[in-house]
Swiss-Prot record:
Its main location: cytoplasm. It comes from the Bacteria. It comes from Azorhizobium caulinodans (strain ATCC 43989 / DSM 5975 / JCM 20966 / LMG 6465 / NBRC 14845 / NCIMB 13405 / ORS 571). This is Elongation factor Ts. The gene is tsf. Associates with the EF-Tu.GDP complex and induces the exchange of GDP to GTP. It remains bound to the aminoacyl-tRNA.EF-Tu.GTP complex up to the GTP hydrolysis stage on the ribosome.
Length: 307
């Protein structure tokens, strides 16, 4: 049986909004497994649906870079937030983002590419930076989006310098229309993505396991009702779920009376051509990475015992 610590209870409470005793019971029932405990609480009707937002537990920077019909995003992690304010680290991340823009965008291609203006690779340059700053760093992930016509809008939230911050977003709008108006619309949608964190563009982008899990939770919450009634409730519940987590169906953050899809359609007139939201990327710093939390009191006690 896993130990149910106060920290574990707090983490579950932060993720679900459920009461402390309910969180403790959920963790006890599920042997300390956070994800299983979330499902347990939801089946009991004690927690809201959780989006797939990983625990933010790593530092560093997310950066975006764009040029014409191309844009890239990259995440470089470090051990402390102090490094994110280091000018050398920021310069490295900026150049690494440019490399992502000029390669296929994969993190493997970025690491192996030559660092701009030097005869070493990006990976080698990072190794030198690690030795200089004295803190471990990693090239975590990168991506590149392209359009044949239109724009790729970018947005950075929590910026510490131009194009670098804690959340980076790319939004690809394919269109033959007015570029300036497309850019304005794209930035608004990028801000929406940063704020509402959609899981996918539409329902087809959500994996079958996630859909099955959501439906199972809905069905279990209405056990005891006739099967046909349960199915209707689950069908209605899944429609609501898709509206909450898919970009095109989400209420637009700048005007909640319209969906993002409706906003795109309405703007086609002023842009002068059809608009297709081809894709988006949202990188949140440290998302999905767990960082070991030190027990300061235990460290002090251990140090005292060694002295």
């Amino acid at each position: 049986m896993a130990a149910i610590t106060a920290g574990l209870v707090k983490e579950l409470r932060d993720k679900t909004g459920a009461g402390m005793m309910d969180c403790k019971a959920a963790l006890t029932e599920n042997n300390g497994d956070i994800e299983a405990a979330i499902d347990w609480l939801r089946k009991k009707g004690l927690a809201k649906a959780a989006k797939k937002a990983g625990r933010v537990a790593a530092e560093g920077l997310v950066a975006v870079e764009s040029s014409g019909h191309y844009a890239a995003a990259i995440e470089v992690n470090a051990e402390t937030d102090f490094v994110a304010r280091n000018a050398d680290f920021q310069a490295f991340v900026r150049e690494a983002a440019k490399v992502a823009l000029n390669t296929d965008g994969s993190i493997e291609a970025v690491a192996a590419a030559h660092f701009p203006g030097e005869s070493v690779t990006v990976a080698d340059k990072l190794a030198t930076l690690i030795a200089t700053i004295g803190e471990n760093m990693t090239l975590r992930r990168s991506v590149r989006l392209t359009v044949s016509a239109g724009v790729i809008a970018t947005y950075v939230h929590g910026a510490v310098s131009e194009g670098q911050g804690r959340i980076g977003v790319l939004v690809a709008l394919e269109s033959q229309g007015d570029v300036e108006k497309l850019s304005t619309l794209g930035r608004q949608i990028a801000m929406h993505v940063a704020a509402l964190n959609p899981l996918a563009l539409d329902a087809s982008g959500i994996d079958e396991a996630t859909i099955a899990r959501e439906k199972a939770i809905l069905l279990e919450k209405h056990q005891g009702k006739p099967a046909n009634v349960q199915e209707k409730i689950a069908e209605s519940g899944m429609k609501t779920y898709f509206k909450e987590v898919t970009l095109l169906e989400q209420p637009f953050v700048h005007d909640g009376s319209k969906s993002v899809a409706q906003v795109l359609k309405e703007n086609e007139g002023s842009v002068g051509a059809p608009i297709t939201l081809k894709g988006f990327v949202r990188y949140a710093l440290g998302e999905g990475i767990e960082k070991e939390e030190s027990d300061f009191a235990a460290e002090v006690a251990a140090a005292a015992g060694q002295s």
